[in-house]
Amino acid sequence: MMGGGGGGGGGGQMQQVAQEIEQMEQEVEAIDEEIERLREKQTDIDEAIEAIETLDSGSTVQVPLGGDAYIRATIEDIDEVVVSLGGGYSAEREQDGAVSTLETKKETLDDHISDLQEEKAEVETEMEELEQQAQQMQQQQMQQMMQQQEQEDE
């Protein structure tokens, strides 16, 4: 069902290029989603840092229990903060140490986002090259079809 004949497998090649472009579009979308997820984590870290720096002992806060349920709690001691270290481990840190740990996490996220942006740029460049290749193939097919039509008309 390759119309016109004489395409020399160009249709299959076009289909392969189109599939590669589609895969790359999906890869770019996945990278964008991961970048967005990491930026949300950065926002969470910023909010945690702000809370650590602004809350005082005796402040009342809402503590999430899960399932969109909260309780009000009064902070007894803001001098010690429990910070997740990753891998399911947590550690108690003084206020400054907690902020420092969170800032380090944020820097790590920045690095990861930069790596993902570079990867995305590489994929997009490769995708542009493939799109140009597809356009050239399409133009060649059109020229071949026009030549065949001219020959058939003679």
Swiss-Prot record:
One of its GO terms (cellular component) is cytoplasm. Molecular chaperone capable of stabilizing a range of proteins. Seems to fulfill an ATP-independent, HSP70-like function in archaeal de novo protein folding. Belongs to the prefoldin subunit alpha family. One of its GO terms (molecular function) is unfolded protein binding. Its main location: cytoplasm. Residues 119-154 are annotated as: Disordered. Heterohexamer of two alpha and four beta subunits. One of its GO terms (biological process) is protein folding. This is Prefoldin subunit alpha. It is found in: Cytoplasm. CDD domains: Prefoldin_alpha. The lineage of its organism: Archaea, Methanobacteriati, Methanobacteriota, Stenosarchaea group, Halobacteria. Keywords: Chaperone, Cytoplasm. Residues 132-154 have a biased composition (Low complexity).
